């Protein structure tokens, strides 16, 4: 399991550099990324779609897979707890007992805190910048490598 997570995130980072530089520049320039932007990167990283996939199509695909609720919209800003949930769910994160049972953004955030990826004092509803999003992906990859 740990090897598959490591492999997944190795592929994620490889794909990050292979992606359209315009998309990467676009996300890094944002102070607050949208759910559609996060969905796009999760889909491309996990080979759920091609680089030419639109943010809306990526969001709709992940919504069908229960990553998002039916009431959520792709242009809404994404919260820190939802980013943790997207990353964890896309990597099939095992997590602690509560995350294993409930598989919710709340417990995904708590898992990221317990793994040391995030400090204990972060707020679940705070918005995430593009650079923070990439740092969370990178932080999760480092933890996955250590656990191998």
What is the meaning of each model-derived region?
Residues 18-37, 42-52, 71-148:
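Terminal recognition/anchoring or ligand-binding modules at protein termini
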Residues 55-67, 76-80:
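Acidic helix-start/capping segments at beta-turn-to-alpha-helix junctions
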Residues 11-13, 65, 137:
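Prokaryotic Sec-type signal peptides and long signal-anchor helices
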Residues 4-14:
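Sec-dependent N-terminal signal peptides
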